Structure formats: C-alpha cells, structure tokens
Amino acid sequence: MALINPQFPYAGPVPIPGPAPTETMPLLNYRVEGRIAGIQQARQFMPFLQGPHRAVAEQTYHAIGTGIQMGQTFNQPLINTQEG
C-alpha cells in the first residue's frame, strides 16, 4: 500500500525528457530511465517524511538504485570483442 501525502498527491507519470524510444533503444532501458526520473522526483519529497516512513523510503530508494545499477550492468548487448 502506497502512502500518499495529501499535500503532494501523485499527479501521474513523470514526463521523461529526451528522444522517444526507438528500435535502437530497448524498452527496458526506457523503463529504467523512467524509474530514474521518478526517483529524482521522489528525492524532492524525502525531507517531508518522518520516522519509519522516512526509513522505508530511504531503504526503497537504495534498493531501487541498486537494481537500476544491476540492470544497466546486465542489460548490455552481447558484443563479440574477439577480432578475426
């Protein structure tokens, strides 16, 4: 269950700056960029969280950040670097 601060209601998806996804930009990368934008927006509201809500938000923030780093590491195309 998401805790929503009535002072800052969620207004819907965050628009992502930059080019629209194409065949050369896999959908997974586009979703990762969207999550990064969402985390950057959520970071603005972190000071308003108190006590256990803040602790949970910080744990979630770090867990998502770790997941994004892993996703970027393991979502690389397989490239044969051997010549000849």
From Swiss-Prot:
Subcellular location: Virion
GO cellular component terms attached to this protein's record: viral capsid
Annotated keywords: Capsid protein, Virion
Protein's GO biological process: viral capsid assembly
Predominant localisation class: virion
Disulphide-bridged cysteine pairs: none
Function: Minor capsid protein essential for stable capsid assembly of complete particles.
Quaternary structure and interacting proteins, as annotated: Dimer.
Protein name, per record: Minor capsid protein P30
Source species of the chain: Enterobacteria phage PRD1 (Bacteriophage PRD1)
